[in-house]
Every structure is written in structure tokens, then in C-alpha cells.
Amino acid sequence: MGGLKATTVLEEKRGWCVSKAILLAACCRALGIPARLGYADVLNHLSTEKLRQRMKTNVFYWHGYTALYLDDRWVKATPAFNIELCEKFGLKPLEFNGRDDSIYHAFDQAGNRHMEYLHDRGQFLEPPIEAMRRTFDEYYPGWPDISDATEADFGGEVADETATR
């Protein structure tokens, strides 16, 4: 289960949306801020060709975000793309003000589709690993075990693909 622990993301200095959401939730909880792990299925129009080939789809099942309890309500935060990835993909960085949900933009800065939220899977205190594993086994055959998943060099893939644009 190492790939789905906050300490693993800290040690490896990289992760994917699910592991980054786990890290953000752990940090918030350590500071006394209630936090939950949220998941949604999203259609990603801007993923890399290499990732689409590995996944055999551009639907990202169980995309992770973090829900934080601030000022008597739950607010969504998406800790996935760093500023470098946003710049390479032509995306406006997500802003978080503590009042409004901060989820992926539907369009990039050029007006192209970026992210479509297809299905909200709910919010949990811990990652629903078995449910995630079943979905990944069904839709991503041959994908590595979800519990040991770490991010491939997505930043490198983006750099390679965007260099030719």
C-alpha cells in the first residue's frame, strides 16, 4: 500500500492526483483541519499520448481531490498539476481561496476542452482501495496494482509532447 500513503509522496517528491490528495488531507488533518478524500471520474482531453496508450482511454476513473472543512462547509481542492504542467498544457493554474471549490477548469487558456467531470464517486475518510482496484482492473487491464501506484514521469511526457507543438 506504499503508493497510497502521504509519506510515500513526500519521500518520492512526486505522485498522481490520488496520492497528492491523500498527502493534502494528511497535512490538513495534522493542522486540525477536517479533510476527506474525494473522487470523480473525469474525461481528460489533454493527457499525453503515452498515458492514453497505457490506459487505453482518456477517462480517468477515481480522479482524486481533497475536501476541506472550512468555515462550516466542505470545499474541494485539487492538488494535482504544478505550475510547470499548467504552463506546458496552457492551463490556468487552479486557485484556492478557501471559500469556493477549486477543481479542474473545463477549458484550457486557448478555449480547448480540458476536463469534463463525468461521475462523482463521493468522499471518504480513507481511500476506498478495493473499489478503486475493481474499477482499475475492469477499465485499465494490465495496469499496475493501485496500492503500489506511483506517477510515471508525466512531467517528462508532457515536456516531450509539448516541445513539438
Model-predicted segments: where are they?
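His-Asp-centered catalytic microenvironments across diverse enzyme cores
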Residues: V42-R165
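Active-site neighborhood of thiol-dependent amide/isopeptide-bond enzymes
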Residues: M1-W62
